[in-house]
């Protein structure tokens, strides 16, 4: 469902304010409120909204784009900055980011387009630290500036002089500017953290929460501190390398080594085709590495091409940062709790110490069923690794320190809701509450019915279902459509005003005007999803059944002649519609405004007849616009890539589907080509 203009604008404002807050703390208070991954995810979300809703984006900022974090360069607050600010001799920009091999391919393709093919590259570790620029005059270190906002940096020379990894003198008499990263050794950080934590004041947790934050705090302290001797430094850039006859990155690194600087680990890559292989085999999570990295930097080896490739206001085009996504993150199980689903399925879950994984804050994760707990031997207090399964649902993967004993969480015997004894499935993997009167099962069924996967009654969310159930107003689906009888009671509730109650009741009434497949899907019939619900309604219409009661009268054995309906699915339908409670529900819905409705495919032309299409990436208009356009001209929308696909329509940031289409020799087109097909 597409967002309204007002909701799009609200989302833009919300994301912009959040990112402004994060920037303020990062640039002015030397602390990160969120992880890099979380920040990048929110920034990318705002960029996507800007690209997809340009009109709303322009209206929010009224064309004064300096108010947007996407356009704003200077994030330093005049009133907060106490260190002396100085202008960089050359812009100290950040790196553009790549999150996939497709992003990297676009980076190398751009280089090939502008300066030809067959280039060599340098891949170096991207240190998770504080960027620094060092100025040497007549061989003596005279100034050290942080990146700041890329235009102005803070003068931290007094503390940089105390960092052992930074040579105070070098054998270069010409003025030279070098850039790199200040960071904390992980072993030293943990050792010092344990030693000094108790001596800190009330801000101790902030000061020692991450190595980078602590390094930043030390480096930017107003007075010279001995603590700066704890810090380390890698240098990887020479500003204006042509002044020193440096023509390649490889020569530049050799030059820095000779001058006594430490360098991040790097690899020389002969051509772009080897980049993906190197990254695939690179150990991003290496226990032997004594510093934090958050990716790899890919740089064109030929320095003479850098100016030709140009820059944006935020980054240069000659280099890019490949940001790896962590597969796992370590945390601790604080508690184990159980939930009951709408079918009575028992799910075990872990309450976790909060961590961030791939841009998401995670406080809980699924443990699936008891068999899963037993196999991994999980218990409260254990340190575990978690991952985001399918990039959606966090789950516990394994213990940090495997056990040999039987010290793991015991299975529950009774339903946490109705207290009835639980039953095991035949294979002894899952537990179920079979009590038809279980309150939690009923609540979950109601929640599913009004959810996005069901009837999409947005104003009637899960919290309201719980409240109305507790009040006794909504015990079953029929009660939702009788909620208008509780109008006066609703007005007495806290935060329920006349307008909001009227909107709620209007949306409930409005939900009756729905295609029947959506109603069937909302009923939560076992083994029957949206696709089969659509097919069922189409078949019922073909059999000249014209009202909702047809669902009760239809001979479901006739479905045997349709390939998509196997015996298990047919049995599920027969069982559901034979149940007295369900039959009463259908009769109620039929008598209260629900009709048997089928989605009609409006065909404007047959120009795309029997041609299959799949859309990937961000297009000029919402995807639904193009999907409807294809269907209206006789085309078919596919849900996945296969050899049967005729066309892949590609927008910005297309992802892995584009590569898969190339491998299968599927024709790749853009939205302009689609429009030409319809002329």
Swiss-Prot record:
Binding site for Zn(2+): 415, 418, 433, 438
BRCT domain span: 603-679
Catalytic reaction(s) noted: NAD(+) + (deoxyribonucleotide)n-3'-hydroxyl + 5'-phospho-(deoxyribonucleotide)m = (deoxyribonucleotide)n+m + AMP + beta-nicotinamide D-nucleotide
InterPro entries: BRCT_dom, BRCT_dom_sf, DisA/LigA_HHH, DNA_ligase, DNA_ligase_AS, DNAligase_adenylation, DNAligase_N, NA-bd_OB-fold
Names of required cofactors: Mg(2+); Mn(2+)
One GO biological process term: DNA replication
GO MF term set: DNA ligase (NAD+) activity; metal ion binding
SMART domains associated with the record: BRCT, LIGANc
Keywords: DNA damage, DNA repair, DNA replication, Ligase, Magnesium, Manganese, Metal-binding, NAD, Zinc
Record EC number: 6.5.1.2
The keyword Membrane appears for this protein: no
Cited Gene3D superfamilies: 5' to 3' exonuclease, C-terminal subdomain, BRCT domain, DNA ligase/mRNA capping enzyme, Helix hairpin bin, Nucleic acid-binding proteins
Annotated binding of NAD(+), by residue: 36-40, 94-95, 147, 181, 299, 323
Record-annotated active site: 126 (n6-amp-lysine intermediate)
UniProt keyword Zinc present: yes
Known role: DNA ligase that catalyzes the formation of phosphodiester linkages between 5'-phosphoryl and 3'-hydroxyl groups in double-stranded DNA using NAD as a coenzyme and as the energy source for the reaction. It is essential for DNA replication and repair of damaged DNA.
Family: Belongs to the NAD-dependent DNA ligase family. LigA subfamily.
Protein name: DNA ligase
Organism listed in the record: Mycoplasmopsis pulmonis (strain UAB CTIP) (Mycoplasma pulmonis)
